[in-house]
Each structure stands twice: as C-alpha cells, then as structure tokens.
Amino acid sequence: MFILFTGCQKDIRGPDEIKAKGTLRVLTLNSPTTYYENREGEHVGFERDLAALYADHLGVEVEFLVVDTIEQLFESLRLGKADLVAAGIAKTKARSKGVLFSPAYQKVSLDVVCRRGVKPDSPKDLVGRKLLVGNGTSYVEVLEQLKKEHPDLSWSVVEGPS
C-alpha cells in the first residue's frame, strides 16, 4: 500500500518551499485506518501520524484537508490544493498518471468475499455471480483487466465505504 504521493502540477512545492511557507498541506480521507476523530476529539490514524512525522521532520506545521472520495484526492492534488496525499492508496496504472507514488509501506492482497460454501478458485468462477465493488477502488481496474479474458464477467459499482 502506498500512502503518500506528490502532485505533478506546475506549482509543486518541494521541501524547501514547504519549509519557507511553514505548512505541509496533506489530503486525506476520513477512514479508520487513515484519518478520523476519536472519542476524545483528537484526529488520529496511521497515515495521519506518518504525515505529521514528516511535517515534524521538515520543521513545519501540518494542515489536513479531508475529502470524500479517492477521485477528489487525485483531483485536488492535481489542482495544487495540497503537497501530498496520505490515504492508504493502492497504486494502479490508471492512478499513476500524473502523480508520483512513494515507496510502498505495506503489501495488501485483493480478496473476494463470498457467502459460506462458495469458494471461487479462479476468475472464471466469478462469471455469473453477483459482484459488488466500491466506487473508486482499485478493484474496478482489476475487474476491467479480468474482463478482457472473461468477457461475460460483470459487476456493480456501489457508493460508500468498501
């Protein structure tokens, strides 16, 4: 999993510019593994902590900009609204266009969750099944690639947390 990436917009701020301005601008999502407000009203989360540590390393304040969707992360970054993204994003070919990803900090696997008793062994076993996938997730891109080999493969994209 990749947590930080920098924009390739015209006004990229490198470490020197960030230090001069005194603030690291970070885009993120409200998510239990990324950035959220706990019961004490504190903002916490693994990627939030990593971004805050990077800001400390630079000797600057950190400003978090929370958006609702992965698409908004990419669009806001491309528009220069932030210096980087900290949101547990999976790197895909489509997502790599126009941005630079950091080295991965964690490897994750894509899994299919089925009802008890159903155990697909290969992508062809998914043909004819009702598949639901979260909007904006890397699963959509994977399914689009699998559809080239299995044209009858279909799925529905759903909104909300996935």
Give a label for each model feature.
Residues 8-11:
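Bacterial signal peptide processing site
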Residues 1-6:
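Sec-dependent bacterial lipoprotein signal peptides
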Residues 111-162:
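Pocket-lining segment of extracytoplasmic ligand-binding domains
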Residues 14:
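Nucleotide/pyrophosphate-binding catalytic subdomain
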Residues 33, 48, 52, 56-125, ...:
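Acidic, polar ligand-binding/catalytic clefts
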Residues 36-39, 48-61, 102-103, 139-161:
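Ligand-binding cleft/hinge of the Venus flytrap
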Residues 23-24, 60-61, 81-83, 128-129, ...:
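Loop/turn elements at helix/coil->beta-strand transitions in domains of secreted/extracellular proteins
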